[in-house]
Amino acid sequence: MSDGTNKRILFPLAPEYVGYADQGLSNDMFVAIKPDIEILNTFNGSKQFKYVIDFDAVENVLANDTSISALCVSRPTNPTGNVITDDEVRHLDALAHKYNIPLIIDNAYGDPFPGCIYTDANLTWNSNIILCMSLSKLGLPGLRTGIVVANNEIIKAIGRVNGSMVLSPNAIGPSLVTRLINEGELLPLCKNTVLPFYKNKAEIAINLFDEIFADLPVYLHKLEGAFFMWLWFKDSKIASEMLYQKLKEQDVYIIPGHNFF
């Protein structure tokens, strides 16, 4: 900041998107809080769990760390496929208002597009929320087009930053999405093509998990959205990095989870 202080962003629910790590202006720009774990009772006996926000820990950080300048959460989450509940969103929003900081919601996989959510979840917005969306999860990552819904002050600030950093903005993405919206094609595309495709893949993955790991102490994070499977090897005797190396020797590729915390 202009006064020499460093501001930081709080992730109230880890694991979180590892790509954020390279976006900070300083090495300690991000603070993350580990989740509570809720073991789920599934109707078919599938061993699943869900990460939930530890709100006591979140408020403790907000109350004692004046460097926190924003809350940030992805919904659905890369890498777990977690979709925080409507109640969790409301609670985060209330905390953001209480401590006079914005709530950033990374909505790259969410509604209304690409709409890759497989559970009940409502999209919410107010002037204290910064809602971010992307065309990349529609299969158009090369267009490098993002959409930010925020109050006028935030949008003007982003415009000034882009004016300084982006000398030749990409016009293809905005033009394409404008046409899709104006002609009423975008939402049907998401509902009738994108969502069924990925939901079917998720159901296949869950069935394979149940078959392969039925007798092992392995749990699957409930697939509520996005494109990922997150496995918890409960009581594992080795670290995730070592598991990654051992599986790679067998031509099986995973991503070790410790980097996302």
Predicted segment positions?
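Surface-exposed helix-capping loop/turn segments at secondary-structure junctions
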Residues: P188, F209-L220
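Helix C-cap/helix->beta junction micro-motif
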Residues: K98-Y99, Q250
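Conserved glycine-rich beta-strand-loop-beta hairpin in the small C-terminal domain of fold type I
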Residues: N192-I206, V218-F233
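Short beta-strand segments
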Residues: P12-A14, C72-R75, I104-N107, M133, ...
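Conserved C-terminal alpha-helix-loop-beta "cap" of PLP-dependent enzymes
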Residues: P217, W230-F261
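Conserved core of the PLP fold type I
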Residues: M1-K98, I104-N126, I130
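Conserved core segment of the aminotransferase class I/II
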Residues: T5-P12, L25, P35, I39-T42, ...
